[in-house]
Amino acid sequence: MTTRKRPLALLILDGWGYRENTQKNAVYHANTPVLDRLNAQYPNSLISGSGLDVGLPDGQMGNSEVGHINIGSGRIVYQELTRIGKAIEDGEFDKNQALVESIDKAIANQGAVHIMGLLSPGGVHSHESHIEAMCRLAVARGAKQVYLHAFLDGRDTPPRSAKGSLAHFDDLFTTLGTGRVASVIGRYYAMDRDNRWDRVSQAYELITEGKSLHQYSNAVEALEAAYARDENDEFVGSSAILDAQGDSAQLADGDALIFMNFRADRARQITRSFVDADFDGFERNVTPKAHFVMLTEYAADIKAAIAYPSTNLVNTLGEALQDSDKTQLRISETEKYAHVTFFFNGGKEEPFKGEDRILIQSPKVATYDLQPEMSSAELTDKLVEAIESTKYDVIICNYPNGDMVGHTGSFDAAVKACEAVDTCIGRVVDALAKVDGECLITADHGNAEQMTDEQTGQAHTAHTSELVPLIYVGRNGSIENDGRLSDLAPTMLTLMGEEVPSEMTGRSIIKLDE
C-alpha cells in the first residue's frame, strides 16, 4: 500500500522580479488574479537573487544557473564568474594546468590557439575579461597564431551592443602584436541548448571549415553588415573574418580549442560536436583532432580537459531529502530542465534515490514571443497529476516563461507569458489544497519586470538585479525580511520538520504561528 504524501511544492517563476517602476513592466501590467489573491491572503515577502547574496560580484544580476544552485544547496555558492575573476587577479589563471598545457601543445605542433566563447560583459555565461586574459596568456606563452571565435550576446546585454567588445579585441590584438577575431556568429546558433542541431552546425562549420554565410575583412564591419540585415547581436549570421590573403582561420589537427564559457547548459551541445567520438547531432564534414579545454565542467560524460573543475557540494536539498527517505519530483520544460535537476543538485547529473524527473518539451518555435505560453499548460497537466497521486513529499517545478519570453524583448508577449503562468499557478494551488499540500512560490532572478532599457530606449532583454517574490501558501505564519535564495532549502526542511544539514548556511525564514 502506498503511503499518502502531503506534498510541499516549490514553484520557481523564472525571470519574475519585482520592480517599483511600472513602465514596460510586464509583471505589473499582466492580469494575474491568482497571484494577486495569494499575495493578499498568504504570507509574502521579497528576497534577493543577485550580487553578493548569490555569490556573484556586488551588483551583478542573477541568472538561472546561479539561482538554482543557491536554492538547491541552501548556501551562498561562490560562482564561476567570481572564482575565475579572482584567479586572473591573483595570477593563478596564468598557471592553470589545463590552459597552459593546451597552449604549449599547440605551439609544439606549430599549430594555432583557437579561443571561442560568448564575447560579452554580461557575466551570465561568460565574461569578456576572462576571454581577454586567455588571449593575453596564449600570446605570453609564445603562440604566434591566436584566433578568437566570437559568439555575440544581445540577451544578457542590450540587443545591439557588441560593437564596443569587438572593437576592443581588435585593439587588443594590435597591442599584443598577433592574433585576430577570426569569426563572428550569434549565440542563437552557437549556444543552443534545445537540440536544434541545425543551428549548432552553422557555428561548428564556421570554426572547422570557415564555411559561412558572409565574409568580411574585420569584425566590426561584419557586425555593421548584420545590423543592416536587421540582425541583432544574438542572431548574427555566420561570418568569417578573412586575413589579408583572403583566408579564414580553420581549426586543424594539433591546434588548441579553448571554450571560455563558464556556464554549462548552453556550452554542452557545441562542445559535444567537437569532442564526442560518436556524435550524431549532425553530419560533420571534418573532425579536427584538437586539444579541447572546457573552462568549467559542462557535463560529467564529456571527455575533455577542465580548467576549473566543479567544487563538490554535499548535503544539498535533494541529498537531504534522500537521506530522510523522502520522495521528490523535479519537473520543467526543456529550457529549464537542467536547472531543476543538474544545477539544483549542485552540478550532479544522477538523480538521488527517490527523485523522479519529468521533462516537458518546449515548443519548437524560432523565438518564444511567438508562443509566450510555451508548454505551460502541458507542464501543469503533469504537475497536477503528480500532486493528485500523493506520491511525492517535495515537488520542484520551474515555469520558464517570464525569462524565456523576457529575453525576446517583446513587452506584449511577456505580458501574455506572465498571464499564462498565473493561470497555471491557480490550477496547481487548487490541486495542492485538495491533498492538504503547501507551496512556496518564488523566482530565481528578474527579467520580465523590465522590458525597456531606460538609457538606450532599446528593448531590455537581459536579467535584472531586482528582488524576487516569495509567497507561502500553507499554514498561518510570517516571512522574515532580508531573505535570499539560499534560505529556501532550510525553510522547506524546517516546514517539513526535518533537520537542516550543517553545510546549509541559509536560514529558515518562515515562522509558523503557535
Curated annotation (Swiss-Prot):
Cellular component GO terms held in the UniProt record: cytosol
Catalytic activity: (2R)-2-phosphoglycerate = (2R)-3-phosphoglycerate
Domain of life: Bacteria
UniProt-annotated binding residues for Mn(2+) 2: 14, 64, 444-445
Pathway membership: Carbohydrate degradation; glycolysis; pyruvate from D-glyceraldehyde 3-phosphate: step 3/5
Enzyme class: isomerase
Cofactor: Mn(2+)
EC number assigned by the record: 5.4.2.12
Keyword line: Glycolysis, Isomerase, Manganese, Metal-binding
Catalytic site positions: 64 (phosphoserine intermediate)
Pfam (any one): iPGM_N
Positions annotated to bind substrate: 125, 155-156, 187, 193, 263-266, 336
One GO BP: glucose catabolic process
Residue numbers binding Mn(2+) 1: 403, 407, 463
Keyword Metal-binding: yes
Any one GO molecular function term: phosphoglycerate mutase activity
Cofactor: record remark: Binds 2 manganese ions per subunit.
SUPFAM superfamilies (alphabetical): 2,3-Bisphosphoglycerate-independent phosphoglycerate mutase, substrate-binding domain, Alkaline phosphatase-like
NCBIfam families tied to this protein: pgm_bpd_ind (TIGR01307), PRK05434.1-5 (NF003897)
UniProt record similarity statement: Belongs to the BPG-independent phosphoglycerate mutase family.
UniProt function note: Catalyzes the interconversion of 2-phosphoglycerate and 3-phosphoglycerate.
SUBUNIT field: Monomer.
Protein name: 2,3-bisphosphoglycerate-independent phosphoglycerate mutase
Species classification: Bacteria, Pseudomonadati, Pseudomonadota, Gammaproteobacteria, Alteromonadales
Gene: gpmI
